Amino acid sequence: DRASFVVINRHLPVPNFTQEERDGYLYLTTDKLELRYKLGTYPVSNDRCNPNLQITLDVNGVEEVWYPGKQDPYNLKGTTRTLDRAEGDVREWLENGLLSRVGWAVIDEREPRKDGSLSLMFERDTNGGMDWVAQRKDTAALDMYFMGYGHDYKKALGDFTKIAGKIPLPPLYVF
């Protein structure tokens, strides 16, 4: 799998899990969550009452269920590049961020951003040169990351840096 501008490291240790096929579904279970997928279906063709892909996790004794397309009204949002022309509440400008009061967040790299741009990939150079920027070849391919961390926001940010790389410090002159 190729690196993207956001997710540069896709090779992480795999947690212990069990796998079971039952009633036409594949179940992957860890000590933190359970993923259920209806075999033979496209995971984002969902009916919210009976999704063909869902993840269930326990957040402080409350069962939280996620499925593709589920809206998160408790997401704490991302950042904005500028506050130019800002008057009042600017949250509607912001895309969803990594932290949410429901205990999960999703990074969906196949969806267009609010500005219409798409996530770009790094194309491997097979001639020994450097990888280079490219559009996605398969625009229907799924490229989603579910981050289920409960309310351990520090862990969520730490895990994000494992896949996205270290966050650079601002230049010294800004301090």
Describe each region flagged by the PLM:
Residues I167-F175:
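N-terminal small/glycine-rich loop or linker at the start of catalytic domains
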Residues D1-P168:
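N-terminal accessory segment at the very beginning of proteins
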